[in-house]
Swiss-Prot record:
Similarity remark: Belongs to the YajQ family.
Any one of the GO CC terms: cytosol
NCBIfam families: PRK05412.1
Gene Ontology molecular function, alphabetical: nucleotide binding
Alphabetized InterPro entries for the sequence: DUF520 (IPR007551), UPF0234-like_C (IPR035571), UPF0234_N (IPR035570), YajQ-like_sf (IPR036183)
Pfam families assigned to the protein according to its UniProt record, in alphabetical order: DUF520
Keyword list, A-Z: Nucleotide-binding
Native source organism of the sequence: Hahella chejuensis (strain KCTC 2396)
Task of the protein: Nucleotide-binding protein.
Name this protein carries in UniProt: Nucleotide-binding protein HCH_04620
Amino acid sequence: MPSFDIVSEIDRHELTNSVDQANRELEMRYDFRGVEASFTLSEKSVEMAAEQEFQLEQMLLILNTTLSKRKVDLRVLGDSTDQKSGKQVKRSYALKEGLEQKVAKDIVKKIKESKMKVQASIQGDQVRITGKKRDDLQEAIQLLRGDESLDVPMQFNNFRD
């Protein structure tokens, strides 16, 4: 029986390249001359540091641009937390990786509500979709891609006939 997996993974290499490119762009921009501002990437977050609040907004635009150029889904950036320390303002964005249980249940619910001839099962941090025909699986992929209420980056992999 044909099947595929729905996962939420981050391409770490492209994410690292995006953050490096954003740092290079910061050095080149005229409005950031003489300003201590930087992007740092850790295992679970992307951190921005600048001197003013409005500079963080500009930095977010730079980061979003570099992420989209590298074809990294912008939804990988989760909730932000702000900190003020001395003359610097820091904003940290958590990285979303893996499907949470609630999101996985929503995916299964949407598949079942659509009354397609496929079965969905949750397997850890991924959802496996199985069906009798390849066309049914492709229809399920189109349904999930078109759904705006699911606010997670999804990849469809491990497609088997």
